[in-house]
From Swiss-Prot:
It is found in: Mitochondrion inner membrane. The cytochrome bc1 complex contains 11 subunits: 3 respiratory subunits (MT-CYB, CYC1 and UQCRFS1), 2 core proteins (UQCRC1 and UQCRC2) and 6 low-molecular weight proteins (UQCRH/QCR6, UQCRB/QCR7, UQCRQ/QCR8, UQCR10/QCR9, UQCR11/QCR10 and a cleavage product of UQCRFS1). This cytochrome bc1 complex then forms a dimer. Pfam families: Cytochrom_B_C, Cytochrome_B. GO terms for biological process: mitochondrial electron transport, ubiquinol to cytochrome c. Its main location: mitochondrion. Heme 1 (or BL or b562) is low-potential and absorbs at about 562 nm, and heme 2 (or BH or b566) is high-potential and absorbs at about 566 nm. It comes from Neurotrichus gibbsii. GO terms for molecular function: metal ion binding; ubiquinol-cytochrome-c reductase activity. This is Cytochrome b. The lineage of its organism: Eukaryota, Metazoa, Chordata, Craniata, Vertebrata. The chain crosses the membrane at residues 33-53, 77-98, 113-133, 178-198, 226-246, 288-308, 320-340, 347-367. The gene is MT-CYB.
Amino acid sequence: MTNIRKTHPLMKIVNSSFIDLPAPSNISSWWNFGSLLGICLIIQILTGLFLAMHYTSDTMTAFSSVTHICRDVNYGWLIRYLHANGASMFFICLFLHVGRGLYYGSYMFMETWNIGVLLLFAVMATAFMGYVLPWGQMSFWGATVITNLLSAIPYIGTDLVEWIWGGFSVDKATLTRFFAFHFILPFIIAALAGVHLLFLHETGSNNPSGLSSDSDKIPFHPYYTIKDILGILILILALSSLVLFSPDLLGDPDNYIPANPLNTPPHIKPEWYFLFAYAILRSIPNKLGGVLALVFSILVLALMPFLHTSKQRSMMFRPISQCLFWVLVADLLTLTWIGGQPVEHPFVIIGQLASILYFSLILILMPLASLMENNLLKW
């Protein structure tokens, strides 16, 4: 008798995706982040659902409802901090997942990569809107500053901003619609993640060497299921430690002050995972130029397959490209630091130099290094 997992219409899909899936025998722990992102998404949807049961999306009661969740709801503090810090873990996994893709040339799977870029935008949009919901000072002013950037769009900008606000300022209508979008987007992200996997399984996984692994495949279960479970346990340990020992480590103290449109905080800044993009935005004195640089700082990822000039896929055997890759990582860390600093000397010039270096590395230096490596190998 044939096994039910190979005959049942639903089980067949699960079987071909997670059990009998042929996987390269040499994929390292850098390939764990896909499953970790899936777990992060599940954690966020579940904790978010329980938070939504007690949250009210009204300007008068939003802040109080979050306080009520933390003080009066059974384990409400745990759910709230799991959700807030779960977002940080989500972005850590995202950045490492994208970094892995850049290093090992995974972007050569065009469809999978482009869906991934779309997913990155969707997660960033969701996180931004979620940050507005507690209706603290940083929530309100963050929403005001970031939505205001759309007014830089020629001709339609002002109308567009007022349309998004649902009025002439960030107010009740804005909060209600942000809550609605924040609730629906994770389900869209889950659907996109399904498409992401669908395209990945069309080609099979890449591997550290960047060479074809068709001649050496192993079943996903038990080898990579066990490996994924280890990764998940480490993720849960890290998240639990953060939530139970220092839940406010990555948050902003200003968000414990209720939103006040009449009082601007001294330093308006987003959550840590947006600081690199915020630094790029601030480093250009022109409003429209800054907005374009901000969007392009993420959108440039979609150009990666076209900027690939090397004859090898992975950076595993390309020392010059490796050096530039790690310079890019250091540059992004510098931008993240600058994004959290006030707009004054010397931070302004450091931010501008780091922004120039960011785009130079991706658009010019790395493709040139690849060409140079091709010549060194005399191919």
